[in-house]
């Protein structure tokens, strides 16, 4: 079944607080680690004594579920009830692929199910979620790794737990070997960013280019019905070149028009 592989996943745990009976939606850019937040929560629940049979994890990116309709979502609950007693803990990955999913999600909250959902920013922006789910879910924004998390995920810095919380072991400052490892990690982080998946990818630039194109076309062009994607692409490039510098709209407009692209 879907969830059988989750206990075996080697995760870098990211700190997140949960209300005991809260329902949660994790939103963020593609490949920022939203699914891993679900895996992390499932592993924590299993560690606390929950049985794997209490967990229902469904990945709606699965091609076998591409044609699923909102009225068929209740089949998940019916199938669970046929095999188990009690209410399951529900984990739905990329549920926004099912049109009308929000009605099902609201009903689950009203019926006191524990639900954890992920969705891409393309269809599940934070401001949309508040309206769509009627305040029944907590929203958690997920971002790529910070540099501290990046170091931790690569095992470069050890962390020691004290009564005051987690603090970095500063002994690395006196170790040339570890210091060199930190500098190499920073160079990697500076050039490629903190997407968790990049840790295991050799062709990082190709992977990033693929993610950029998916975000550009699916999350920007299609979502906002942009008619001139070339003008948008040039605008993004100009803004990326002017990080931390004021940029006038007229300057961008003139730049785009000078290339023969009409806004």
Label the model's feature ranges.
Residues 114-120, 141, 150:
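Structural recognition of the conserved hydrophobic beta-strand(s) that form the central parallel beta-sheet
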Residues 157-263:
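Interdomain hinge/linker elements that couple catalytic modules in large macromolecular machines
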């Amino acid at each position: 079944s879907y969830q059988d592989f989750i206990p075996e996943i080697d995760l870098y745990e990211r700190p997140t607080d949960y209300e005991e009976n809260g329902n949660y939606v994790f939103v963020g850019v593609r490949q920022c680690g939203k699914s891993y937040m679900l895996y992390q929560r499932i592993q924590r629940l299993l560690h606390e004594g929950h049985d794997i049979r209490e967990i229902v994890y469904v990945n709606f990116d699965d091609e076998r579920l591409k044609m699923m309709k909102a009225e068929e979502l209740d089949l998940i609950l019916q199938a669970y009830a046929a095999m188990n007693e009690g209410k399951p803990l529900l984990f739905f990955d990329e549920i926004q692929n099912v049109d009308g999913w929000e009605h099902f999600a609201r009903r689950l909250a009203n019926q006191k199910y524990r639900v954890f959902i992920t969705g891409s920013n393309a269809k599940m922006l934070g401001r949309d979620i508040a309206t769509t789910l009627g305040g029944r879910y907590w929203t958690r924004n997920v971002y790529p790794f910070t540099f501290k998390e990046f170091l931790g995920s690569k095992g470069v810095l050890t962390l020691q737990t004290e009564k005051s919380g987690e603090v970095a072991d500063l002994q690395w400052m006196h170790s040339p070997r570890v210091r060199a490892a930190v500098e190499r990690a920073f160079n990697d982080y500076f050039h490629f960013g903190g997407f968790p998946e990049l840790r295991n990818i050799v062709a990082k630039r190709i992977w990033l280019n693929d993610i950029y194109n998916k975000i550009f076309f699916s999350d920007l062009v299609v979502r906002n019905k942009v008619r001139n994607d070339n003008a948008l692409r040039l605008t993004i490039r100009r803004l990326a070149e002017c990080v931390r510098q004021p940029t006038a709209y007229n300057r961008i407009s003139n730049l785009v028009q000078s290339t023969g692209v009409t806004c």
